[in-house]
Design a protein with these regions (language model features):
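Catalytic cores and adjacent flexible loops of soluble metabolic enzymes
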Residues: 1-175
Length: 175
């Protein structure tokens, strides 16, 4: 889904599995557009029996449903109050420094990629490469939005980097 599913789509998917599958149903939600927790909880509400998550959403690019947030929501859903002290201590002592070092998690570029069904690796590559400034990243996203970017291809990234779709301005003319 590239992280772009919404709760209505989750309900449709879970119901399709419930009607055609006798095994357990679960969800692994990406957080490109900040929907991972809501989508995970919708899947639980619709009958999913397991939910995948990672501490602080750790994962490639925008990451996944965050275990700490999911734990809070599941407690509310099940009217529980589990002790989260050890989890929060683990986050503060180990995962927060790792997240700072490796920079996973949602941002505006991943959100746009999710919205336009663009593979998150394009964003991951651009934000880790100093050749790309904000205008370059937006230009590449716009190119991929029009040309398609569901699967990552480094050659397409290079082509998109040099593609300019705006109106040229200036007075210089070759002689």
């Amino acid at each position: 889904s590239m992280g772009s599913l919404n709760i209505r789509q989750i309900t449709t998917i879970v119901n399709t599995f419930k009607n055609n599958w006798s095994g357990a149903i679960g969800i692994h939600a990406h957080d490109s557009m900040g929907n991972a927790i809501n989508n995970s909880m919708q899947a639980v509400n619709d009958g999913a029996s397991w939910v995948d998550s990672t501490v602080t959403g750790m994962g490639r690019g925008p990451g996944n449903a965050q275990t700490e947030y999911l734990s809070i929501e599941l407690d509310s859903y099940r009217d529980l109050d589990t002790n989260k002290t050890k989890l929060f201590k683990l986050i503060r002592n180990h995962f927060k420094p790792l997240k700072g070092q490796y920079g996973w998690g949602i941002n505006s570029y991943y959100y746009l990629a999710g919205k336009h069904n663009i593979h998150p690796t394009y964003i991951q590559k651009m934000i880790s490469d100093t050749r790309y400034d904000e205008e370059d990243i937006i230009s590449v996203i716009n190119y991929l939005k029009e040309q398609g970017g569901k699967g990552f291809n480094p050659d397409v990234l290079e082509t998109a980097r040099h593609f300019y779709s705006g109106n040229a301005q200036g007075t210089w003319k070759p002689e």
